[in-house]
Amino acid sequence: MNANMLKGRLREKAMTQADLAPQVGLSLSRFNAKLNETGGAEFSLSEVRAIKRVLDLDQEQTEQIFFS
């Protein structure tokens, strides 16, 4: 996962992790754990889809952030 790219997209959209987390259905602490892959935590496919929608990511951006 490319956390820096995701954080950059958040900045482009003038959003914070605290703004995005509830829109994905996560608490801020759980979102951060998944963002930092703490303890092997990963975003689920439904969470990736929600992030893609909220941040208006295209397919290439989504793949670069979550699957590279």
Residue ranges and their predicted role:
Residues S46-Q61:
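DNA major-groove recognition helix of helix-turn-helix/homeodomain DNA-binding modules
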Residues K7, N32-A33, E63:
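Key DNA-contacting residues within the recognition helix of helix-turn-helix
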Residues Q61-S68:
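Short amphipathic recognition helices of helix-turn-helix/homeodomain-type DNA-binding modules
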Residues L20-A21:
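Short alpha-helical "recognition helix" segments of helix-turn-helix
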Residues G25-E42:
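Recognition helix of helix-turn-helix/homeodomain-like DNA-binding domains
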Residues M1-M15:
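A short, Lys/Arg-rich alpha-helix, primarily the initiator
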